[in-house]
């Protein structure tokens, strides 16, 4: 897990080392500079420094304790329902479809039977793209033609999962319609119809966020959270950014857990988020 985050945060760590320079002693002023360079928001940097002990020199264990408090949001358990239904949301280009494929791969490797629902019937090519991923990962998929009612696809997917004893249902959704009102209506309908197919479904509503956007992705996430009450987020493309510190803002501003992080193109490059490993990766070069 440590090496996984090291790969994902390589650019962020490079910036941290650059700001730290030859300094062995980490003062609060230097820490502020380092954290801002890693795209931790100014407000959170000030908060972190405020909650540290009063002395000017910063100790790793104190900093880790304070920073760890941002990742305490409770994750919904995934082993209570069968099939367990997850609704995946996100704008086009955030890595939503590839994240769905990687999630399916992850679950399949945990000996779970997975089925995908191609409910992005709006974007040209979205159904075909998900179909290709389903073939690559070797999982089932329910799909229709472009323009078909996405809530009907969700209903059919969940119904098949119940009938055929699937463990996991992963439902793709449209990232963009002509306007927000249409998207809100569509997502609300998918949630309502999913619950008709299986009481309590969808069990988790997860937003996929592009890690290269840093703090800018928070506004996007808030908009989705208003449309559909989210349960957590997946952060993608962490390996392509020096903004690894934005995870603090995402967790705090949204008051949501980070479920998974993606750090590359390989199927194994999506892993469950581990706050302890993330903090160690971030802090080790500061206190080297």
Label for each model-derived stretch:
Residues 1-88, 103-105, 109-118, 136, ...:
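Non-catalytic terminal/linker segments enriched in charged/polar, low-complexity residues
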Residues 76-288:
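P-loop/Walker A NTP-binding module and the surrounding RecA-like catalytic core of P-loop NTPases
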